[in-house]
């Protein structure tokens, strides 16, 4: 019995000691925010020369993007939501540049953005071409005035920029490249500082040369020979990459401005990540998505170099957030979502 008393006493003493110890340790338990003195926390300073809230203007295209299934309104235009998502994935916001609004309104919106994107589509003449040409001219003027104002043009947008620079309406040639997944033949200039492909990881560049990671979806383009022998084009552009069509004919798939931050892509990176129509053959592999992201990162990194910092409220009043996207992909063709401007 005495032994039992001793054991009981020993047990309670041990338990009491443990409780005291636990209480003592509780005094030293900290939240993550309490681990450092606020004065001791420091972050690498951001580059004061860069604009970390860039805004991109995207030019709308005539129609509803769905052959009239979504809207037959006179003068309706659209932006495929995939272009908006592409820009946002790079860290920028979007202001729609409505192609048939007044020049005064367009100019006001251009004063709010740090770069422009020309989309794919079908319109090759009329008011749309006139507006695109005027915006392109103003973009070059912005650069001449000292602002770094990038332009990126996909598919039809790229072809129209080529036509505008060449000052020839018949400069383009027919190619069989509709809904064509493709690899790229990278030229030496692709390694140049400030080029699109310089932003790509080295392993992804290797994949681009062998795997079909980009989607071409056009019927016209320009051959390398024709671009190089046209003085206006060769003075303005250098070729970064070429591709072959279904007949084995080679066309320029990527080119960039020698003097200006202008990039022309005949392939459409936004479709890899954001378009799912069964009629397309867009690659959706992980590496194809990396191509989308790397292209977006490049373009928005260029836009951050723009010194234009407009009034924040004017920007907010013009953002595409003021509009709602419409689902147009129920038929499994065309764009999954579009923004309509009526």
From Swiss-Prot:
Spell out the molecular function terms from Gene Ontology.
gamma-glutamyl-peptidase activity; omega peptidase activity
Catalytic activity, EC:
3.4.19.9
Alphabetically sorted, this entry's keywords are: Cell wall, Glycoprotein, Hydrolase, Secreted, Signal
Catalytic class of the enzyme: hydrolase
Glycosylated sites: 72
Task: Using the record, list the residue span of the signal peptide; answer none if the entry has no such feature.
Answer: 1-21
Question: Pfam families in the record, alphabetically?
Answer: Peptidase_C26
Q: Name any GO cellular component annotation.
A: vacuole
* Source organism, top-level taxon: Eukaryota
The tissues in which it is expressed are: Expressed only in young (1-15 day old) leaf, stem and root tissue.
In terms of SUPFAM superfamilies, this protein maps to: Class I glutamine amidotransferase-like
**Family listed:** Belongs to the peptidase C26 family.
Please state what the protein is called.
Gamma-glutamyl hydrolase
Q: What organism is the protein native to? A: Glycine max
Lineage of the species this protein comes from: Eukaryota, Viridiplantae, Streptophyta, Embryophyta, Tracheophyta
């Amino acid at each position: 019995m005495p032994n039992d008393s001793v054991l009981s006493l020993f047990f309670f003493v041990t338990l009491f000691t443990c409780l005291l110890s636990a209480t003592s340790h509780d005094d030293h338990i900290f939240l993550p925010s309490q681990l450092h003195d606020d004065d001791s926390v420091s972050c690498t300073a951001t580059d004061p020369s860069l604009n970390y809230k860039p805004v991109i203007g995207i030019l709308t295209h005539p129609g509803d993007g769905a052959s009239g299934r979504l809207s037959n309104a006179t003068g309706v235009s659209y932006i495929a939501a995939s272009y908006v998502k592409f820009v946002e994935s790079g860290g920028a916001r979007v202001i729609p540049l409505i192609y048939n609004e007044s020049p005064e309104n367009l100019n006001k919106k251009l004063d709010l953005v740090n770069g422009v994107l020309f989309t794919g589509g079908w319109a090759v003449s009329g008011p749309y071409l006139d507006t695109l040409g005027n915006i392109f001219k103003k973009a070059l003027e912005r650069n001449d005035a000292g602002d770094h104002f990038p332009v990126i043009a996909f598919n039809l947008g790229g072809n129209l920029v080529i036509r505008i620079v060449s000052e020839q309406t018949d400069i383009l040639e027919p190619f069989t490249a509709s809904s064509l997944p493709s690899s790229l033949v990278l030229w030496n200039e692709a390694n140049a500082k400030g080029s699109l492909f310089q932003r790509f990881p080295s392993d992804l560049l290797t994949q681009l040369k062998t795997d079909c990671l980009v989607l071409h979806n056009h019927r016209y383009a320009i051959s390398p020979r024709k671009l190089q022998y046209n003085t206006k084009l060769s003075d303005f552009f250098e070729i970064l990459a070429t591709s072959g069509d279904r007949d084995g004919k080679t066309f320029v798939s990527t080119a960039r401005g020698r003097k200006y931050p202008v990039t022309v892509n005949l392939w459409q990176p936004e479709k890899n990540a954001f378009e799912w129509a069964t009629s397309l053959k867009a690659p959706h592999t992980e590496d194809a998505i990396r191509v989308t992201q790397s292209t977006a990162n490049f373009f928005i990194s260029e836009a951050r170099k723009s010194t234009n910092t407009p009034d924040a409220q004017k920007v907010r009043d013009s953002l595409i957030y003021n509009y709602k996207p419409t689902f147009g992909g129920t038929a499994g063709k065309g764009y999954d979502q579009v923004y309509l401007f009526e």
